[in-house]
Each structure stands twice: as structure tokens, then as C-alpha cells.
């Protein structure tokens, strides 16, 4: 039986108490100061760290410019339609995720609960990135930058052994920032410096959300616009760097054969899906504060296009920096080889250059074979292509690769401050959406809001997240961060959004939803949106769900990358049983909300019917 939303009373008919309550709630609900605040809030939430550190990595992995083909196709068939769907649901129901899906059907309340659980998991670990951003920002004012050189050993007779085997940027990240343990089984204690940075990050979030849309609406102007200012500055600087063209040519040279690679399409769909923040409930929460007549279709298109354009723009910046770093390392490698051969064979200074290096190497190998064989093991194989092929994503790109490029720039402190300030703004903008996804359903709840004011609810949520997030500041914290980042949301969000599309199209009814949209926006629903919602997007999500589920099953024993201080590099290890249990709990705790809440609703309804039935 389809569960309908109660219609307004017809003329001459007195509205019932439920309808009066709904109207009072609609009137009392806070709203954005203007539509621009809503758009900026969505952009600030959607445009996040993934645009800067994951999309460039995918371009690098899957054929440079050719990756844009599946990416743009997935934007059209998946990104825009699903974004519009969530904005329309939030604006129509004018409630957070739990209330919105309960209005469509009481049996779907679990969809909103699952979104809140996933958003809670995300908030716990995501703000740790902002804590790291604060840590690097504070250290960016030092001259020289603390990650530019290796520290001396305890005897002050040479450089630290771990740093020499790795690099100064890796050492600062793994030892000075994380103080990482050798494995996930050695948790260590909470480290006070990262803990203070995490506390500061949560304090910033709390101040931004303290007054709801009143404060968030003003903050999003800054968190949305500031990253673009920094990216433009970095683009101008990046294009003037030596070797930037090498990186840009690498990015825009398409490898057409990658279009036949299924993983390129899978990753394009996944990037669109997670970059827009679908399924978390944040977009529904933001849209619930809109005017009912707001043109959410136009805003969905604007936000999705800006989000994807930012990914491409950030990639141009990243690859120009990447080209500079690769060229710097390549030329540094050549100089070391030239110096080695010049000293070993007593060559005249300036005789050996990069242009004649290979020719001279062949000559020396044929003329002095014995001596050359002694030197040969110390001659590095320098290749610009191999430097450009070194693919890094996530924290490795943000805190190691970028840091390494920045330390070699002139006025490196300035560029470091700008870069890590930009990361902070991107991270804070996303955190505003994550916390809105949690707070909106809680403040909508009459049970909770009748006992606690909004400020207290916000403070309690931030305090709990901050306390639990201290796990990520331990010596093994980065390993737990990777677990949450890899497993807390992937399958859960796919299932949530799949149920959302089915709920709107087949439970609430597509025709009925189309009628609601016509009443809100004054325009009919285009066939494109209906086809995407009813058929294409659900099938695509099912395909992604099957792929990730089979990938987890076929992978066998799950593994992680651990830092080996003795080798100065990452090594692969198997997850211990307790870590596997946490992974299973993360996936199950959110996905099981949907069937369990539906079952609980069914049982409660049956008990109510049984209790009200007359006794024979």
C-alpha cells in the first residue's frame, strides 16, 4: 500500500491537527538568507579534498585526457540526476534525511538513519585531515621549512638514518606528524600535538555551525571562494615553473586504449558519486532550508558542473606542479650521474652534459670496461617518464608530493601557507555539510529538541566526534584512518542511494513526485530526469555495488600499507582479526539500519493493530 503525504484541506474544510503542526513547522523552519547562500553551501560541501588529491590521481592512472570521456559521461547519467533527486527530496519534504524518508514511507526511516550513521563515521575521521592541515600550516612559517632537510642524528655526526633512507618530506609526515607505529597492532598513546590540532579543528567547526544557517550561510562564502583564489594563484605560479609543460603534456596526452579498461569507467562513476557527496544526507539537509519555490533543478546542474570543472582545473594546477617536481628530480638525478662519472673518470668539468650523457656512457663502457663495471652499480637510471608515472593519491599527494614540490620553490614559506590554508578551507567546507547531515535530523526531532537547544546539540555532536577522533591521533591512528576512509562509506552509500531512487520512483511514485516538482518550480519534469531516475542511475548503482562487493570477496585477506622505519618505505601487511572485525562492523552498522528499522516499524505497526483489536 502506498503511503501518501496528507493533502492540504480543501476550501471550507477545517485542517486537522497534523496538518496544522506541519504548517507551523514549515513556517518556523530556518531558511537561507538567499539562494546564493544555498548554492555556495553545496559547492563548499561538494568541492573538497577529493577534487584536489583523487581526481588528478585517476587522470594519471587512466590515460590522462582520455579519462575525461568516462568522467563526463558519468556526470551526465549519474551525477546530475542523483544530485537533483536529493535536492528535490529535501526541498519538497523540508526535513532532514530521517524525516524526509519517513514522510515518503515510515518503512524508509532507516535510509535516513543509515545516512546519519555514515555521516557520523565520516565526521569522526575527516576532521583529522583538517588537524593535519593546521599542523602543516603552523610549521609553514618556519625558515627553512621543517620538511626541507633531514634532521641530524642523536650524535650530530650525520643525518637521521630513517630520513636518509626515505626523504625529508616522508620523514616529516610519517615521523614528525604521525609518529607512526610499525603496525596497526601497536596503537601507542594519544599524541598531544595532533590532539590539540584536532581539538582546534572541531572548535572551528562548532563556531561555524553554532547559529545554524545564520552562521553557516556567511561562512560558506569564504570556504567556497577562498580555494579558487588560491588555485588561481597556484595556476599562475605553476605555469611559470620549470618543467610545468612536461606535467601538462602528460595530463592532456590521451591514452585511447584506456577507454576499453572497465576500471576506468568504474572509477569515473565512483569519483562522481563520492565527489558530489551523495547519500550522506547533507544535500537533503541543505535543501530543506530552501524556499519551496526554489529552482533546485538549475542549482543541481550548477553545482555538479562547478564541482567537475573544479576537478579538471585542480588537475591542471596539480600536473603543472607535478611536472616541476618530476623535472627537478630528473635533472637532479642526471647531475648526480654526471658528477659521479666526472669524478670517477677524471673528466673535464663541463664536458659531460645531459645532452651527451648516453653517448659518453657508451664510450666509457667500451673504452674502460673494468672501471665502468665498478661504477655501474652506483649509476642511477634517470627517466622523466618514470618520474611522471609515479602515481600518488590521498594524504600522500597532499602532504608528501606537494610538500616536496613546495620546498623547492622560491619563497617556499608563502606557497606552503597558501596551499595548506586552501586544504583547510576545502576540508572545513566539507565538514559543514557532514555535520549538517547529522544535526538537521536531530534538531528536527521533537524528542531531542524539546530537551536541548540547537547550540547544545551542536556542541554535543562536536564533542563526541572530537573525543572518538582521538583514536586517529595515536601512533597507529593513520592505519585506523585508512580503514575508515576505505570501508566506512563505500558500500553503504551505494545501497543508500539505490534505495533512495527506488523509494522516489516506485514507492512515492514518479508521477506524484513529478507533480510535486511542477508545483514547486512551475515547470514539467524533463524526460531525461525521469529516465535517469527510474532506470539508468539505479542500474548503474547496482553495477557499482556488485563490482565493489565482488572486489572485496575476491581480494581475499585484506591488507594495508605499514611504515617500516628501518627501510624508510611502506610495506604491505595483513590486517589482524580485530581490524577485520572493525571493518565488518563499519559496513554492517550502516547498511543494516535500512532493513532493521523497516522491520522494527513493521513489528510496531502489528503490535498497535493487535492492541487495538476488540477482544472476542
Curated annotation (Swiss-Prot):
A GO BP entry: glycine import across plasma membrane
Glycosylation sites: 155, 381
GO CC annotations on file: apical plasma membrane; brush border membrane; plasma membrane
PROSITE patterns tied to this protein: NA_NEUROTRAN_SYMP_1, NA_NEUROTRAN_SYMP_2, NA_NEUROTRAN_SYMP_3
Alphabetical keyword list: Amino-acid transport, Cell membrane, Glycoprotein, Membrane, Symport, Transmembrane, Transmembrane helix, Transport
PANTHER family found in the cross-reference section: SODIUM- AND CHLORIDE-DEPENDENT TRANSPORTER XTRP3 (PTHR11616:SF44), SODIUM/CHLORIDE DEPENDENT TRANSPORTER (PTHR11616)
Family of the protein in this entry: Belongs to the sodium:neurotransmitter symporter (SNF) (TC 2.A.22) family. SLC6A20 subfamily.
Protein name stated in the entry: Sodium- and chloride-dependent transporter XTRP3
Gene source species: Rattus norvegicus
Amino acid at each position: 500500500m502506498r503511503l501518501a503525504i496528507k493533502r492540504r484541506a480543501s476550501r471550507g474544510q477545517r485542517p486537522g491537527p497534523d496538518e496544522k503542526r506541519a504548517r507551523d513547522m514549515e513556517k518556523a523552519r530556518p531558511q537561507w538568507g538567499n539562494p546564493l547562500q544555498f548554492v555556495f553551501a553545496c559547492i563548499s560541501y561538494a568541492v573538497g579534498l577529493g577534487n584536489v588529491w583523487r581526481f588528478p590521481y585517476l587522470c594519471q592512472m587512466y590515460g590522462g585526457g582520455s579519462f575525461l570521456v568516462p568522467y563526463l559521461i558519468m556526470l551526465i547519467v549519474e551525477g546530475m540526476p542523483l544530485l537533483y533527486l536529493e535536492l528535490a527530496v529535501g526541498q519538497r519534504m523540508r526535513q532532514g534525511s530521517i524525516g524526509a524518508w519517513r514522510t515518503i514511507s515510515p518503512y524508509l526511516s532507516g535510509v535516513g538513519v543509515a545516512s546519519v550513521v555514515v555521516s557520523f563515521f565520516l565526521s569522526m575521521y575527516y576532521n583529522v585531515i583538517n588537524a593535519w592541515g593546521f599542523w602543516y600550516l603552523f610549521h609553514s612559517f618556519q625558515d627553512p621549512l621543517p620538511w626541507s632537510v633531514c634532521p641530524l642524528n642523536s650524535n650530530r655526526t650525520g643525518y637521521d638514518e630513517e630520513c636518509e633512507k626515505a626523504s625529508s618530506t616522508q620523514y616529516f609526515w610519517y615521523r614528525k606528524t604521525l609518529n607512526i607505529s610499525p603496525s596497526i597492532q601497536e596503537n601507542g598513546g594519544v599524541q598531544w600535538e595532533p590532539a590539540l590540532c584536532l581539538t582546534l579543528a572541531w572548535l572551528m567547526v562548532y563556531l561555524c555551525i553554532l547559529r545554524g544557517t545564520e552562521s553557516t550561510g556567511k561562512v560558506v562564502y569564504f570556504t567556497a571562494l577562498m580555494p579558487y583564489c588560491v588555485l588561481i594563484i597556484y595556476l599562475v605560479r605553476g605555469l611559470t615553473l620549470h618543467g610545468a609543460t612536461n606535467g601538462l603534456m602528460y595530463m592532456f596526452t590521451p591514452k585511447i586504449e584506456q577507454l576499453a579498461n572497465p576500471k576506468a569507467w568504474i572509477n569515473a562513476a565512483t569519483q562522481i558519486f563520492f565527489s558530489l557527496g551523495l547519500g550522506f544526507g547533507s544535500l537533503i539537509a541543505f535543501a530543506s532550508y530552501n524556499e519551496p519555490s526554489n529552482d533546485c533543478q538549475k542549482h543541481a546542474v550548477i553545482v555538479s558542473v562547478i564541482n567537475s570543472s573544479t576537478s579538471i582545473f585542480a588537475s591542471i594546477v596539480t600536473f603543472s606542479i607535478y611536472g616541476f617536481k618530476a623535472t627537478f628530480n630528473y635533472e637532479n638525478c642526471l647531475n648526480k650521474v654526471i658528477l659521479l662519472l666526472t669524478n670517477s673518470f677524471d673528466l673535464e668539468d663541463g664536458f659531460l652534459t645531459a645532452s651527451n650523457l648516453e653517448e659518453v656512457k657508451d664510450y666509457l663502457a667500451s673504452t674502460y670496461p673494468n672501471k665502468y663495471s665498478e661504477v655501474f652499480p652506483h649509476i642511477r637510471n634517470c627517466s622523466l617518464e618514470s618520474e611522471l608515472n609515479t602515481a600518488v593519491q590521498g594524504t600522500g599527494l597532499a602532504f608528501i608530493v606537494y610538500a616536496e614540490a613546495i620546498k623547492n620553490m622560491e619563497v617556499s614559506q608563502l606557497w606552503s601557507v597558501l596551499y595548506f590554508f586552501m586544504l583547510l578551507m576545502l576540508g572545513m567546507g566539507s565538514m559543514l555539510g557532514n555535520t549538517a547531515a547529522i544535526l538537521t535530523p536531530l534538531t528536527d526531532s521533537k524528542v531531542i529538541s524539546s530537551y536541548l537547544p540547537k547550540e547544545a546539540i551542536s556542541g554535543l555532536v562536536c564533542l563526541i566526534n572530537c573525543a572518538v577522533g582521538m583514536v586517529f591521533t595515536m601512533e597507529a591512528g593513520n592505519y585506523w584512518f585508512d580503514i575508515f576512509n576505505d570501508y566506512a562509506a563505500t558500500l553503504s552509500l551505494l545501497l543508500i542511494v539505490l534505495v533512495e531512487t527506488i523509494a522516489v520512483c516506485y514507492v512515492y511514485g514518479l508521477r506524484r513526485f513529478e507533480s510535486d516538482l511542477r508545483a514547486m518550480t512551475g515547470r514539467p519534469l524533463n524526460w531525461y530526469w525521469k529516465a535517469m531516475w527510474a532506470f539508468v542511475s539505479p542500474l548503474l548503482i547496482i553495477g557499482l555495488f556488485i563490482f565493489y562487493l565482488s572486489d572485496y570477496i575476491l581480494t581475499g585477506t585484506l591488507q594495508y600499507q605499514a611504515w617500516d622505519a628501518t627501510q624508510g618505505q611502506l610495506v604491505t601487511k595483513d590486517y589482524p582479526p580485530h581490524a577485520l572485525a572493525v571493518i565488518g562492523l563499519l559496513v554492517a552498522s550502516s547498511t543494516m539500519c535500512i532493513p532493521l528499522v523497516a522491520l522494527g516499524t513493521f513489528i510496531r505497526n502489528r503490535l498497535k493493530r493487535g492492541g487495538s483489536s476488540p477482544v472476542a
